[in-house]
A protein has these predicted regions:
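Glycine-rich phosphate/diphosphate-binding loops and the adjacent beta-loop-alpha structural elements
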Residues: 1-15, 101-105, 134-140, 171, ...
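P-loop/Walker A phosphate-binding loop and immediately adjacent motor/lid segment at beta-alpha junctions
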Residues: 56-58, 62-74, 110-134, 184-204
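Active-site gating loop/helix substructures
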Residues: 39-100
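Electropositive, gly/pro-rich neighborhoods at or near active sites that engage anionic ligands
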Residues: 1-66
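C-terminal functional extensions of proteins
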Residues: 142-219
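Conserved phosphate- and dinucleotide-binding cores of soluble alpha/beta proteins
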Residues: 67-70, 103, 107-160, 171, ...
């Protein structure tokens, strides 16, 4: 929804910054929303078999066809600059929350924008990664919790995540089976391996059912 919505808003206002500003008014948002960059970038993936995919939308489709995992994600141009105010906001933050979201097409690309990962590492803020509840077909098939964190560390180095919040809630099996039929499964919480990545763990009941879907509890 978010990608389609912002494309429509940008088409309406002809300016991404203005579309974000107007969206804040529409949804009565508090605080400030900043796009990580104003430059036009392309999210690309290199698979373990050497295949290169130069389109965010095609990544899951090609992976499913080739049954090859992602080796790395990169953005072009690689030296794109952060939007005005982004690095300052990171420096001034009390807490930096990473995730939940699509690991390779959402979370990691934001960290690849020039200076962003470095600013997070240097920040004195509380840096926490919120674990995904389910794996994502075509991106994180069979990924455990530690493999999500390891992928981030391999792309931008250790230091952007200090803590990880993961779910300890019980999910009714019938809902899990619904996701299994679509190629998704619960993220295995291999907590001992997370500690090897140098990340402290925080247990919370994060999951709840909303309109038949497994979601993070906003409370």
């Amino acid at each position: 929804f978010s990608d389609i919505y912002f494309l429509a808003m940008q088409d309406l206002y002809k300016d991404f910054t203005e579309s974000v500003k107007q969206s804040q008014n529409i949804f009565n948002m508090t605080g400030k929303v900043l796009p990580v960059t104003l430059e036009e970038i392309q999210i690309c993936a290199e698979l373990e078999d050497g295949t290169v995919i130069k389109s965010k939308d095609k990544i899951p489709e090609v992976i499913n066809d080739k049954t090859s995992n992602i080796s790395r994600i990169y953005i072009t141009p690689s030296n794109c600059k952060p939007a005005p105010g982004v690095l300052e906001a990171i420096q001034e933050a009390d807490a930096i929350i990473i995730g939940p979201g699509s690991l390779y097409t959402n979370v990691i690309p934001n960290l690849l924008v020039k200076g962003v990962a470095k600013a997070i590492k240097e920040s004195k803020a509380f840096k926490v990664y919120v674990s995904n509840l389910m794996t994502e077909p075509g991106q994180t098939d069979n990924y455990t919790l530690s493999e999500h964190i390891k992928a981030i560390n391999e792309h931008v180095g250790k230091g952007v995540i200090e803590y990880c919040i993961y779910d300890t809630g019980e999910i009714i099996p019938e809902y899990i089976r619904k996701y299994n039929m679509e190629g998704s499964e619960l993220v295995e919480q291999d907590t001992s391996k997370v500690k090897v990545e140098g990340v402290y763990l925080i247990q919370r009941k994060l999951s709840h059912i909303e309109n038949g879907f497994i979601r993070h509890n906003p409370d």
